[in-house]
Structures are given as C-alpha cells and as structure tokens.
C-alpha cells in the first residue's frame, strides 16, 4: 500500500518559491482581528511538484470507472459518458459565466435551461420541471417537500405518512423520515411487485403519498401501475416516481401517463452525465400542472424580449440549491438528449433491456434468479445456491469478480432477496463484453464448487486486498495521526 501524502512530506520540500517582494510587510494582528488568526501554521505536506504529481497519478491508476471497464452496479446505470458532452459544457460561453451576471448577458444559458426543462417534460409526461436539485436524493427531498406543501396549502394537515415498498431504494424512507413523515412499508407479492391488497390496507386519509420506482429494484415493471395510481388518488394521496430506473422505460413509456404526480430524474444515470467524483449529479423534479406553483423558484420563463428568471411564485417551497442547479451537468445532459433525440433514447432503452435479459438468460443455470422472467434494464440474481452448497457468500462472489477485471454488481440489495446480486449492464455494453462477464461468473461458480477458499480470500490481484468492513465501520481512522486526534 502506498503512503498517504503526509507520510511523504519532507521539511523544506515544497515545489514552489515566491520571488522577492518589494511590498512593505505588515503585522497581521494589526490589520486582522486576532480571533481569526492562526496560532500555528497549518500542518500541510511539503513535497516537490513531481512527487505530488506521482502520488495522485498512482492513486488515479487504482480507480475504476466506466472508462476502465464493465461496471454492472445495479440501480446505478453506469453508462458511458460521451466526451462530446464535456466539450459542450466547456464552451467558453457556458464555462465562463458567473451566476450574478445580469439576465440580458446570459440569454444563451437561460435558453438552454428553458429548452432542457421542455425536454424533461416531454420525456417524463410532466407539465413543469425545476432543474435545481443537485442529486437524486436531493430530488426526492424536493419532491416530498412539494407534496408536503401541497397538503398543507389545502389544510390537509393529517397527512403525515408516506408509503414505501419493501423493495424501495434506501433513500426513499430516509428522505421521508428527514421531512418528518412516518414511513409505512408496503409489501411485495409473490411476483415481486407491489401487493395491491396490502397497499389498499395501508391507504388512509393520513397518507400523503406513495414513493415508487418503476421498473422496481428487481428490474420488474409494475404492471398494475394504473390501479396503484387509482388506489392512491382515491384516498387523496399523491404518487411519487423515483427516477432511478428510468433507463428501463425512457423513450418507451412516460411516468406522467401512468398516473404519477411528481417525479425526479437522475441526469447522472439516464442522460449520460458522470457519477460521483466525476459529477456532480443532478436530480431535476417534474410535476403535474396542479403542483407547479409549489416548485422551487426561480423558473426560467420566456417573453418577447427574451428569457428571464421568475421569482414571483408565492406558493413556491423556495430555493433548494444555490443559484440555478448544477448548470454544467445540465448542459451535458441536454447535449445527450439532443444527440440521441426521441428515437435514440428509445433505442438506448431497448438495448439496455436486451442486455439485461441476455445476462439473466445465460446466468440462470449457475445462479438462483428468484424472479426469473422478462425483466427491464436490470435483474437480481442470488448467491443463495453457492452459500447453501459451498459456503460461498454473495460478498465472496463480488470480491472475486474484481480479480477478473470487473466492478462488482450491487450486493445485498434489494433487501427482499437473500444474498442479492443486482446486475445492470446498460445499453453501451457490447455483446463481447457481456460474454466476458458471463464467462467470469461461470468460472466463479465453478470455483465455488471446487475451491471455495479462493473466493473466501478474494480479491487477490488488487492493490488493496479484502478489507475488514466491520472494523472500518466501527473503528474508522479519518485523520492522519500527525494532525491530532484520530
């Protein structure tokens, strides 16, 4: 394991030296309130430029992303990020803007935001969108804030519950809890779909809404979605669409046509913008017309003289993000939508579904697939067979995949499947790449039967071997010891 950068520090080893300065020195304490002055110099590492470059290049070579290889992380839609989108976001007219510029000087940017909103409305079947939320979970929060504001505006103050399926993303109950809602779990039926009878039993005048992903986290389409919407609406609740799995229906079906009232998109999933450290993300929120007044302000509007920011929205929940959202991400997503168009988005969806079913079909002999039927963009396999017969867990299988050069799938989720392996291949993967993954998974299944210990100790070829995850969670070391308390 390489040293942390502090351990490489050498006194006097800095890489830059300032030329002599002919400006008279001042006493800092005479100009700055001593309360804001450091008593000691910060403990920063001292290294030459080449050592800093080598340190971070070495670390970067350990990273794994979609540009390195296959990344089948279920429910994360790790698709290729077209590099032309980066070019678009770096155009000087976008990259050099400042959010405090007057509206008349940023008409191009406002037009892009206006057009991006219209595209989102068309794709989602919604009437208005806000582009402010900075991530998927942030979009969830914004959407539930809108639902809460709607009920409060109607003086329907008894609606303090949010329904969440037992297969839902963990952010759904977490978001509802943050906003003070009581979370009520709705059971799945034997098909892996929302149990309509249980939903009906959960509905009441205290329910503000139901959060739903469609396709769900099993990769299955909620075929009774229209009846689900009817049940929720009949009792005065609203239907929220978590857009995490939009890639399974984009260009083919629209949440707004299914009865959803509020939704969020993940631009960093469905629309080809980077995830995580390559991001940031973006989670635009769309609503039907009767909820549009509650959207965060400002919204971009158009008049004869041009585009402008509309703050005159008395029912608005207010801003949920500084300025106007992660603008560069929106530029990239807009470029992606415009490049593919409607037919291209539909084809991308169809290829994602094809790839998912191709993997499911070829892995069904070696791995248990609890809901083994036509799926959408992802499916859930299970390591139950390997655990029962050979003592090899899903975690062992996932770690071993790293030795074969693949990022592991999502593991142990959804919670309703024991030893779950949630696999999402996305549309940008070739058949040849999928065949390589199938071969690796089959070889791991053989190893589980013939040499299970090799899986128990995996990974073997990575720089960092198997991490003690329990110890890392319970005894984290978050600071370099030289900086003080751990």
Swiss-Prot record:
Main EC class the enzyme belongs to: oxidoreductase
GO biological process: glycine decarboxylation via glycine cleavage system
PANTHER family the record matches: GLYCINE DEHYDROGENASE (DECARBOXYLATING), MITOCHONDRIAL (PTHR11773:SF1), GLYCINE DEHYDROGENASE, DECARBOXYLATING (PTHR11773)
Family statement drawn from the similarity comment of this UniProt entry: Belongs to the GcvP family. C-terminal subunit subfamily.
Name used for this protein in its record: Probable glycine dehydrogenase (decarboxylating) subunit 2
Signal peptide: none
UniProt keywords, alphabetically: Oxidoreductase, Pyridoxal phosphate
InterPro entries for the chain: GcvPB, GDC-P_C, GDC-P_N, GDC_P, PyrdxlP-dep_Trfase, PyrdxlP-dep_Trfase_major, PyrdxlP-dep_Trfase_small
SUPFAM superfamilies reported for this sequence: PLP-dependent transferases (SSF53383)
Parts of the chain that traverse the membrane: none
Catalyzed reactions: N(6)-[(R)-lipoyl]-L-lysyl-[glycine-cleavage complex H protein] + glycine + H(+) = N(6)-[(R)-S(8)-aminomethyldihydrolipoyl]-L-lysyl-[glycine-cleavage complex H protein] + CO2
Encoding gene (name): gcvPB
GO cellular component: cytosol; glycine cleavage complex
Cofactor(s) in the UniProt record: pyridoxal 5'-phosphate
EC number in record: 1.4.4.2
An example Gene Ontology molecular-function term: glycine binding
Modified residues annotated as N6-(pyridoxal phosphate)lysine in this record: 269
Biological source species: Syntrophomonas wolfei subsp. wolfei (strain DSM 2245B / Goettingen)
């Amino acid at each position: 394991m390489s040293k942390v950068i502090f351990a490489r520090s050498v006194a006097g080893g800095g890489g830059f030296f300032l030329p002599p300065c002919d400006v008279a020195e001042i006493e800092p304490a005479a100009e700055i309130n001593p309360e804001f002055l450091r008593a000691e110099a910060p403990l920063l590492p001292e290294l030459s430029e080449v050592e800093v470059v080598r340190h971070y290049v070495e670390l970067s070579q350990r990273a794994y992303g979609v540009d390195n290889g296959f990344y089948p992380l279920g429910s994360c839609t790790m698709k290729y990020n077209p590099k032309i989108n980066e070019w678009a976001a770096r155009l000087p007219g976008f990259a050099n803007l400042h959010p405090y510029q007057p509206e008349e000087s940023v008409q191009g940017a406002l037009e892009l935001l206006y057009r991006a909103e219209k595209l989102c409305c068309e794709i989602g079947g919604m009437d208005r969108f806000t582009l402010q939320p900075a991530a998927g979970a942030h979009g969830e929060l914004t959407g539930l804030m809108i639902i809460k504001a709607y009920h409060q505006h109607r003086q329907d103050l008894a609606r303090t519950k949010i329904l969440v399926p037992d297969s839902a993303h963990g952010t759904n109950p977490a978001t509802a809890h943050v906003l003070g809602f009581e979370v009520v779990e709705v059971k799945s039926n034997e098909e892996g779909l929302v149990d309509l009878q249980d939903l009906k039993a959960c509905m009441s005048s205290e329910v503000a809404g139901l959060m739903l992903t469609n396709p769900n986290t099993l990769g299955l389409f909620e075929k009774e979605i229209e009846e689900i919407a009817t049940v929720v609406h009949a009792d005065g609740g609203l239907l929220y669409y978590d857009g995490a799995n939009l890639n399974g229906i984009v260009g083919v079906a629209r949440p707004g046509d299914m009865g959803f009232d509020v939704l969020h998109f993940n631009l960093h999933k469905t629309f080809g913008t980077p995830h995580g450290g390559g991001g940031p993300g973006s989670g635009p929120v769309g609503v039907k017309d009767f909820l549009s007044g509650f959207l965060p302000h400002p919204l971009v509007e158009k008049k004869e003289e041009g585009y402008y920011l509309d703050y005159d929205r008395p029912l608005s929940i207010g801003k949920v993000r500084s300025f106007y959202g992660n603008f560069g991400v929106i530029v990239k997503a807009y470029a992606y939508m415009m490049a593919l168009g409607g037919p291209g988005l539909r084809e991308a969806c169809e290829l994602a579904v094809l790839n998912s079913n191709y993997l499911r079909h070829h892995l069904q002999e070696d791995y248990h697939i609890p809901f083994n039927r036509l799926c959408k963009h992802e499916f859930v396999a299970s390591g139950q067979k390997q655990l029962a017969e050979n003592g090899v867990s899903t975690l062992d299988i996932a770690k071993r995949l790293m030795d074969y050069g693949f990022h592991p799938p999502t593991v142990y989720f959804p919670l309703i499947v024991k030893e779950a392996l949630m696999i999402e291949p996305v549309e940008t993967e070739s058949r040849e790449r999928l065949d390589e993954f199938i071969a690796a998974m089959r070889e791991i299944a053989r190893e589980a039967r013939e040499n299970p210990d090799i899986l128990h100790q995996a990974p073997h070829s990575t720089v960092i071997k198997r991490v003690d995850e329990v110890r890392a969670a319970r005894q984290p070391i978050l600071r370099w010891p030289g900086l003080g308390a751990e």
